[in-house]
Amino acid sequence: MNAERKYLVLLAPVISEKSTMVQQQANQFVFKVARDATKREIRSAVEKLFEVQVLSVQTCNYLGKEKRVGRHVGRRSSWKKAYVRLAEGSSIDYGVA
C-alpha cells in the first residue's frame, strides 16, 4: 500500500455506546472505512498510523437509508465499518475531549 492510500482507507472513528462497550470488553476499535478497502489494507493502515499491533479485522457493509423530503425520495450513501481488535497492551487515543 502506498503512503497516500493509508490516509484514505480510514475515514473516521465510530464513537457510540456499542463501540465504547466493545472497546472496553474486547479491546476492539471501530472505524468508518472506504467502501473499497480490504481487510489487509485496514490492518496495514491502523498499524502504521497508530503504531499498534492488530490481531484481527472484521468488516460490515451498510446500505444507505432511503430518505424523503416532501415528494422527493433520495438515498444516503452506503458505507463500510471495520472492527479492529488490538493486541493486549495496545490502545488508540482518539483525542476526544
Swiss-Prot record:
Protein family (similarity comment): Belongs to the universal ribosomal protein uL23 family.
Functional note: One of the early assembly proteins it binds 23S rRNA. One of the proteins that surrounds the polypeptide exit tunnel on the outside of the ribosome. Forms the main docking site for trigger factor binding to the ribosome.
MF (Gene Ontology): rRNA binding; structural constituent of ribosome
GO biological process, one term: translation
Alphabetical UniProt keywords: Ribonucleoprotein, Ribosomal protein, RNA-binding, rRNA-binding
Pfam families for this protein: Ribosomal_L23
Subunit structure: Part of the 50S ribosomal subunit. Contacts protein L29, and trigger factor when it is bound to the ribosome.
Annotated protein name in UniProt: Large ribosomal subunit protein uL23
GO CC terms in record: ribonucleoprotein complex; ribosome
Domain of life, source organism: Bacteria
Keyword Ribonucleoprotein: yes
